[in-house]
């Protein structure tokens, strides 16, 4: 009986950290890899790569914990989130706080193996991860904060590799914010009706009938910024072809969200994993002289 209870608790922690749903970690991973490959340029040192990959999964898990902690009073009123570990009682508030601290401490121990500039930047990463979940109560632009949180690994990666944050770094950071606002608006379109009822704010609500148009403009901005980064760094044809493919994926997403159906909007959100992957493969091909 005791093992059963322990096993159930571990499964609840597993669900709370979303380790059963890797899409969020992947959307955080791809920009991190973009930055590491451009900053190096090429393949980064194995230890730095390992620290950032592990950090992505740990901090994404920590972000999910604090997000559910912040939303614990709201999630029970939304059909999609009512069975999450905190509102369902599978995990207590005290356990959630302890889990968050453990995940952050492990992440920070990894960062301590890097240079001073990266360590200092990691403090801002923690602040963004903590602040984001509460923004949806006060502003219709929480997706912008999410983009900054998901993209802060970009200046950290540049700092870890070169102890500098050049123009390419900040252009990539901006591109990631635009991308995050676009894909998280698609995600927010799934819950828009529920969010309006319980007072949660989002760009999906703010954009209203112009949501598809604004998402399209943001996606064009992402492609333009990534093309500029390619020009600044002398990247090859493989990279530019990846931008073309990413553009085709964005067009497909526009088709999916055309009627604003929940399942289709969620499918469009999930499709962004391929956008990140394609752009990374383009970078890799360019540096490997394909």
UniProtKB/Swiss-Prot annotation:
Pathway: Cofactor biosynthesis; ubiquinone biosynthesis. It is found in: Cell inner membrane. It is a multi-pass membrane protein. Gene3D superfamilies: UbiA prenyltransferase. Keywords: Cell inner membrane, Cell membrane, Magnesium, Membrane, Transferase, Transmembrane, Transmembrane helix, Ubiquinone biosynthesis. Its cofactor is Mg(2+). GO terms for molecular function: 4-hydroxybenzoate polyprenyltransferase activity. GO terms for biological process: ubiquinone biosynthetic process. It is an enzyme of class 2 (transferase). PROSITE patterns: UBIA. The chain crosses the membrane at residues 23-43, 46-66, 99-119, 141-161, 163-183, 213-233, 234-254, 268-288. Belongs to the UbiA prenyltransferase family. This is 4-hydroxybenzoate octaprenyltransferase. It comes from Escherichia coli (strain 55989 / EAEC).
């Amino acid at each position: 009986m005791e093992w059963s209870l322990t096993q159930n608790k571990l499964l609840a922690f597993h669900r709370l950290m979303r380790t059963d749903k890797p899409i969020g970690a992947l959307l955080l991973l791809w920009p991190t890899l973009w930055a590491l490959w451009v900053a190096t340029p090429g393949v980064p040192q194995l230890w730095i790569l390992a620290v950032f990959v592990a950090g992505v999964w740990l901090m994404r898990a920590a972000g999910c914990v604090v997000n559910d902690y912040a939303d614990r009073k709201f999630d029970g009123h939304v059909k999609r989130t009512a069975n999450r570990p905190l509102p369902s009682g599978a995990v207590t508030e005290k356990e959630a706080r302890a889990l968050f601290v453990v995940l952050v401490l492990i992440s920070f121990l990894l960062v301590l193996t890097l240079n001073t500039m990266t360590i200092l930047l990691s403090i801002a990463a923690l602040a963004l991860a903590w602040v984001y979940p509460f923004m949806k109560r006060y502003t219709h632009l929480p997706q912008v904060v999410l983009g900054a949180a998901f993209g802060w690994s970009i200046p950290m990666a540049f700092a870890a590799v070169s102890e500098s944050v050049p123009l390419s770094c900040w252009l990539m950071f901006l591109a990631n914010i635009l991308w995050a606002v676009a894909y998280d608006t698609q995600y927010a379109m799934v819950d828009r009706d529920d969010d309006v009822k319980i007072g949660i704010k989002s760009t999906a609500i703010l954009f209203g009938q112009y949501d598809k148009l604004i998402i399209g403009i943001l996606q064009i901005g992402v492609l333009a910024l990534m093309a500029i980064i390619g020009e600044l760094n002398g990247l090859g044809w493989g990279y530019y072809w990846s931008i073309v493919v990413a553009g085709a994926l964005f067009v497909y997403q526009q088709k999916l969200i055309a009627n604003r159906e929940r399942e289709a909007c969620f499918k469009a959100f999930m499709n962004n994993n391929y956008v990140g992957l394609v752009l990374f493969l383009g970078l890799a091909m360019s540096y490997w002289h394909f």
